[in-house]
Amino acid sequence: MSVAELKERHMAATQTVNDLREKLKQKRLQLLDTDVSGYAKRQGKSPVTFGPTDLVCCRILQGHTGKVYSLDWTPEKNRIVSASQDGRLIVWNALTSQKTHAIKLPCAWVMTCAFSPSGQSVACGGLDSACSIFNLNSPIDKDGIHPVSRMLSGHKGYVSSCQYVPDEDTHLITSSGDQTCVLWDITTGLRTSVFGGEFQSGHTADVLSVSISSSNPKLFVSGSCDTTARLWDTRVASRAQRTFHGHESDVNTVKFFPDGNRFGTGSDDGSCRLFDIRTGHQLQVYNQPHGDGDIPHVTSMAFSISGRLLFVGYSNGDCYVWDTLLAKVVLNLGSVQNSHEGRISCLGLSADGSALCTGSWDTNLKIWAFGGHRSVV
């Protein structure tokens, strides 16, 4: 069989798969008689309301000289680590806005960072295809450089996301442009498991984000440029447990719902979606109508501790607060006083849910606190 014939058969098979996938999508829509917001409205649920003082900017963290790409909170809620295009990690005291550490990175092209559960170490990764671990208690050398305590090497593409396994300083999961996710043993620096790659159930394009379930740390989800999200069990690396379809473009961010039974996704198609890991069904779409202009991409997301609110960052500088039950925007932090002046690249909620931190291409981070009559939701 010639190369041309093989190519023709491959194109025909691809078209068949796409046609079947579309039929499956339409059948699911027929069987799914309602979504979360439709059910909530029929039950007479009232929307969450926000006043002008219910979520206010209380701190501006200034110190980076380049675009902020990633941030993470410590479990004890009073420190934040941020990664920037300026090639530095900065650890901040969220209560005083003071810097406690400024770490110059061996590779300036950093894309992600994470705090260890104990708060004693930070991890970062980027275009060097490695994940670097820094012990914050290690002394700096004579040149003022903070030494790398462990280098996790093995990916064949950039490291797009990293997250420590909850309650463990010894294990971490990374996602990469090589279409895989990896579970690492930080103590040895070795890969424990590789998810995807040569396995047929893996992603078929760059993996951009991972999120580990806090209720079951053996489960994590990944989002990819192949427009899908996949559920993995760290005990079974050979195949994804489920594949979730619905987005029409890159899935930039994934985040588990607080109960661990659902997760959210955000995409370049401008929408966020809520999926159930037990049934595989899409429960809700969070999407603002736009005109004929460019649709802002979803860059980052976080749920409130109850799951009633969804905080979403967008490429145009907007930061919507969604009512997850009624699928309505209750506040746009991009239109209030002290809003960012550039793309919202990352955001995260403190462990107790009392504060939100946003990072932007305007080089700043901002901490937003609940005030007025609004308690933590």
Curated annotation (Swiss-Prot):
Choose any GO biological process term that the UniProt entry carries and state it. G protein-coupled receptor signaling pathway
Family annotation (InterPro entries): G-protein_beta_WD-40_rep, Gprotein_B, Guanine_nucleotide-bd_bsu, WD40/YVTN_repeat-like_dom_sf, WD40_repeat_CS, WD40_repeat_dom_sf, WD40_rpt
Domain of life of the organism encoding this protein: Eukaryota
Q: Where are the WD repeats?
A: 63-93, 105-135, 154-185, 202-233, 246-276, 293-323, 339-369
Instruction: Name the Gene Ontology molecular function terms of this record.
Output: signaling receptor complex adaptor activity
UniProt KW keywords: Repeat, Transducer, WD repeat
GO cellular component terms listed in the entry, alphabetical order = cytoplasm; heterotrimeric G-protein complex
The record's PANTHER family line, in alphabetical order, gives:
GUANINE NUCLEOTIDE-BINDING PROTEIN BETA G PROTEIN BETA
Protein family (similarity comment): Belongs to the WD repeat G protein beta family.
What's this chain's function? Guanine nucleotide-binding proteins (G proteins) are involved as a modulator or transducer in various transmembrane signaling systems. The beta and gamma chains are required for the GTPase activity, for replacement of GDP by GTP, and for G protein-effector interaction.
Q: How does it assemble?
A: G proteins are composed of 3 units, alpha, beta and gamma.
The identity of this protein, by name, is: Guanine nucleotide-binding protein subunit beta
Name the source organism: Solanum tuberosum (Potato)
Q: Which gene encodes it?
A: GB1
